[in-house]
């Protein structure tokens, strides 16, 4: 073991090609597996980009290096200076003949989890040992795809004229009038972890910034314990001025479609590692109204009365009919937040929408109320006190333009892109009702 590395990596495993035959390289990573067959040792080294085979015949590497390699164990951290040897029979068409070995650190054994995946493990065990679980190629593939998605989202929004912002996560009161908040001690006062950047996004529409977005954590003290809910999540939020609900849906379509394309074009290796069938959606998603959605549910035997939110059973029934990505629009005003703009012709419905993937809601948005008096009236209708929203309401007194926006769940969107059934698979260190560590 060493305190200071004497080398620096020259190549990741994926950078090495058979055409580099005879070239000297330095590779670094973990011992994925080791196998000794008499006077020859095979070591599979794993790094972020894949694996590479190191072949050490005793007669070529010498007694000292051979003995050093033989002492290696699973998950030891090593650096190897070696020569590329083209070999059609080897994985990837080449192998590495080691010239020198540096054992950077050793792994305690037995391992609580097998990164080589020879021994399966339950999700709870994997999450308890997430640092080891994340060494598994399939798990890394999920987060490389997630990274690609976030990069794509940012690129699309920048190209559409949006500015990235950061809003407070320590707040004095609730965002949307609910009670699902985590209280914290804030010096001599009580504060809360923010459940949404919603009110701040809207306030920014009064500044002239016009189009803003934020990718940040949100916190909700909901007692759900399902495969699709977490108490800390990452939300992709946008707000756009001089826009309505249709404009917001158009931007959401672009963001989601472009993310699919970028993942498909740039993460083929990860898609293959996950073993999934990855299909691009159409550029335009189907749009059905809330009325049409409950008609589908009722026709399938799931009773939903007008004005009720969609139950889990209703979402499943609608998802079976619609498949893929689709919008549900024109929701009852009663079940949407106070800041949602009602329809001019029928105030019982509002300009809100959800983006669904089969039976999974991945985004929710709306045109917002920009008129001060109507907003105060709506706050009261929801049984809330306008005095609790003073700082927010001030922004609507001095020239607030029409605006719309949405929030897209990054974790759920990753579920869709990687075809995972459990949201915990798509978050590095998930926080749910039971899990606060690691």
Curated annotation (Swiss-Prot):
CDD domains found in the cross-reference section: AsxRS_core, ND_PkAspRS_like_N
Enzyme class, broadest EC rank: ligase
Cell compartment(s), UniProt: Cytoplasm
Site (Important for tRNA non-discrimination): residue numbering on this chain: 91
Cofactor note: Binds 3 Mg(2+) cations per subunit. The strongest magnesium site (Mg1) is bound to the beta- and gamma-phosphates of ATP and four water molecules complete its coordination sphere.
Chief location bin: cytoplasm
Cofactor: Mg(2+)
Function: Aspartyl-tRNA synthetase with relaxed tRNA specificity since it is able to aspartylate not only its cognate tRNA(Asp) but also tRNA(Asn). Reaction proceeds in two steps: L-aspartate is first activated by ATP to form Asp-AMP and then transferred to the acceptor end of tRNA(Asp/Asn).
Name of the protein in its database record: Aspartate--tRNA(Asp/Asn) ligase
Sites where the protein binds L-aspartate: 176, 220, 364, 368
GO function term, MF aspect, one: RNA binding
Residues that, per the record, bind Mg(2+) 3: 361
EC number, as in UniProt: 6.1.1.23
Region (Aspartate): 198-201
Gene3D superfamilies, per the entry: Bira Bifunctional Protein, Domain 2, Nucleic acid-binding proteins
Catalytic activity: tRNA(Asx) + L-aspartate + ATP = L-aspartyl-tRNA(Asx) + AMP + diphosphate
Residues bound to ATP: 220-222, 228-230, 361, 409-412
Protein keywords: Aminoacyl-tRNA synthetase, ATP-binding, Cytoplasm, Ligase, Magnesium, Metal-binding, Nucleotide-binding, Protein biosynthesis
Binding site for Mg(2+) 2: 361, 364
Entry GO terms, CC: aminoacyl-tRNA synthetase multienzyme complex; cytosol
Source taxonomy: Archaea, Methanobacteriati, Methanobacteriota, Methanomada group, Methanococci
Subunit structure as annotated in this protein's UniProt entry: Homodimer.
Family: Belongs to the class-II aminoacyl-tRNA synthetase family. Type 2 subfamily.
Biological processes, Gene Ontology terms: aspartyl-tRNA aminoacylation
Chain's gene name: aspS
């Amino acid at each position: 073991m060493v305190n200071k590395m004497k080398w620096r990596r020259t190549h990741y495993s994926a950078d090495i090609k058979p055409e580099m035959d005879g070239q000297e390289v330095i590779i670094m990573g973990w011992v994925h597996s080791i196998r000794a067959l008499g006077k020859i040792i095979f070591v599979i080294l794993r790094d972020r980009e894949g694996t590479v085979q190191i072949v050490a015949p005793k007669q070529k590497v010498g007694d000292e290096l051979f003995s050093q390699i033989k002492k290696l164990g699973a998950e030891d951290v090593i650096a190897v200076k070696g020569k590329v040897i083209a070999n059609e029979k080897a994985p990837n068409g080449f192998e590495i003949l080691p010239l020198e070995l540096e054992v950077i650190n050793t792994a305690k054994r037995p391992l609580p989890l097998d990164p080589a995946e020879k021994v399966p493990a339950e999700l709870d065990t994997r999450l308890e040992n997430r640092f080891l679980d994340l060494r598994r190629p399939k798990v890394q593939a999920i987060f490389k795809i997630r990274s690609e998605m976030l990069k794509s989202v940012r690129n699309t929004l920048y190209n559409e004229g949006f500015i990235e912002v950061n809003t407070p996560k320590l707040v004095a009161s609730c965002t949307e009038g609910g009670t699902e908040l985590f209280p914290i001690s804030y010096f001599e006062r009580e504060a809360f972890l923010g459940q949404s950047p919603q009110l701040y996004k809207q306030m920014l529409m009064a500044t002239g910034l016009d189009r803003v977005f934020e990718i940040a954590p949100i916190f909700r003290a909901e007692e759900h314990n399902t495969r699709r809910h977490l108490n800390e999540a990452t939300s992709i939020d946008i707000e756009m001025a001089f826009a309505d609900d249709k404009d917001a849906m158009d931007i959401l379509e672009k963001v989601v479609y472009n993310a699919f394309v970028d993942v498909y074009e740039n993460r083929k290796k990860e898609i293959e590692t996950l073993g999934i069938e990855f299909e691009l959606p159409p550029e335009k998603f189907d749009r059905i109204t809330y009325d049409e959605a409950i008609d589908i549910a009722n026709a399938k035997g799931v009773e939903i009365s007008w004005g009720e939110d969609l139950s889990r059973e209703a979402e499943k029934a609608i998802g079976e009919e619609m498949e893929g990505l689709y919008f549900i629009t024109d929701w009852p005003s009663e079940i949407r937040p106070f800041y949602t703009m009602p329809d001019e012709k029928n105030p019982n419905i509002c300009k809100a929408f959800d983006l669904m993937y089969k039976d999974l809601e991945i985004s929710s948005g709306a045109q917002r109320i920009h008129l001060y008096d109507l907003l105060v009236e709506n706050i009261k209708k929801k049984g809330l006190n306008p005095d609790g929203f003073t700082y927010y309401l001030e922004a609507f007194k001095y020239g607030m333009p029409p605006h719309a926006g949405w929030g897209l769940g990054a974790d759920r969107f990753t579920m869709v892109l990687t075809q995972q059934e459990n949201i915990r698979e798509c978050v590095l260190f998930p926080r749910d009702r039971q899990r606060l560590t690691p």
